[in-house]
């Protein structure tokens, strides 16, 4: 959700988000809103203003140097995070996640890679974590102690002078001290962006050991993430107790029916994410929205009508290439009896 100093604009998001939460709840699901401030991981070309950060240090992958935040501005931002969470609750979200990973503002404060301050928001680990802790406490104050707040952290930033697993474990404990209810264990910053959303050359579930280390540091649940795109691998992570939950984002884009198929014993029918990054990251980066190379319906659901046909027909599809197979699948989903013929 948007963190903004224009209250009217922010309040205007509540109704549109409520439409989403109501549909999720009607299907029996739970939904959390991720709230964040990009900090220095953006540019004036996007926002129209100079980026802000804990220190006036340029992010290596970004074109401009950010402006250092003043103490009063930091206090205002803490309040705005809390206000954003309050709007999320009003919109029907069951929880919020504070994005303190990937070099975004809360994470930038926590990391010595981006925070060079010498006041109460810099220097020691506790000082660097203070911004995130104050955000969590502000949210709890405005939304209630029983309203779940997750905190996302980059366990390892993979940049010189960035967070390592030992410092991140301390930060996770401090967020727990501030009343965070769960730690979402991610990795990387924009300067090491290939680690944030690992491509196919990275091992599956390659960062689970980071989550396992986090579990040793805190008493609250820990979420593992990072190319967990296979049901069996996800289950093995949970059975090993290296994490309490797993994130399967791209896997769910490849097949939104993944949970239902698994629950019905149809795991072998799951459309598997191949970690190609072409449809999800590639197309979204071009401003075309989310797509998926292995599922042509992803992001295009409103443009295709797969409701059952009034009268089932015999359909012959000649050619078993990608297009032919997809045509056969679509026809079958509409209730037709399909024969697929391939020359070879």
Question: Where do the model's predicted regions map?
Answer:
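Conserved acidic E/D residue at the C-terminus of a beta-strand in Rossmann-like folds
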Residues: 340-344
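Flavin-dependent oxidoreductase catalytic cores
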Residues: 1-318, 322-338
């Amino acid at each position: 959700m948007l963190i903004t100093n224009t209250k009217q604009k922010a309040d205007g998001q509540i109704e549109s988000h409520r439409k989403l939460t109501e549909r999720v709840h009607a299907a029996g699901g739970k939904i959390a809103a991720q709230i964040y401030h990009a900090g220095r991981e953006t540019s004036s070309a996007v926002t129209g203003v100079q980026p802000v950060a804990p220190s006036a240090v340029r992010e290596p992958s970004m074109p401009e140097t950010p402006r250092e935040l003043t103490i009063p501005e930091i206090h205002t931002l803490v309040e705005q995070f809390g206000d954003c969470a309050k709007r999320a609750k009003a919109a029907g979200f069951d929880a919020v996640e504070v994005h303190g990973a990937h070099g975004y503002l809360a994470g930038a404060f926590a990391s010595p890679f981006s925070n060079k301050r010498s006041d109460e928001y810099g220097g020691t680990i506790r000082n660097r974590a203070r911004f995130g802790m104050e955000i969590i406490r502000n949210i709890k104050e405005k939304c209630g102690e029983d309203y779940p707040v997750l905190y996302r952290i980059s366990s390892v930033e993979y940049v010189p002078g960035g967070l390592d697993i030992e410092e991140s474990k301390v930060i996770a404990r401090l967020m727990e001290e501030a009343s965070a209810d769960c730690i979402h264990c991610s990795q990387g910053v924009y300067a090491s962006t290939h680690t944030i959303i690992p491509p196919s050359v990275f091992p599956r579930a390659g960062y689970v050991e980071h989550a396992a280390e986090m579990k040793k540091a805190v008493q609250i649940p820990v979420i593992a993430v990072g190319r967990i795109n296979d049901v069996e691998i996800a289950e093995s992570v949970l059975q090993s107790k290296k994490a309490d939950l797993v994130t399967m984002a791209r896997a769910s884009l490849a097949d939104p029916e993944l949970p239902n198929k698994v629950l019905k014993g149809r795991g072998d029918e799951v459309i598997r994410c191949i970690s190609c990054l072409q449809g999800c990251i590639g197309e979204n980066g071009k401003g075309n929205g989310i797509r998926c190379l292995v599922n042509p319906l992803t992001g295009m659901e409103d443009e295709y009508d797969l409701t059952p046909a009034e009268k089932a027909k015999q359909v012959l599809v000649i050619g078993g290439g990608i297009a032919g197979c997809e045509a056969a699948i679509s026809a079958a989903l509409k209730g037709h009896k399909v024969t697929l013929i391939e020359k070879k």
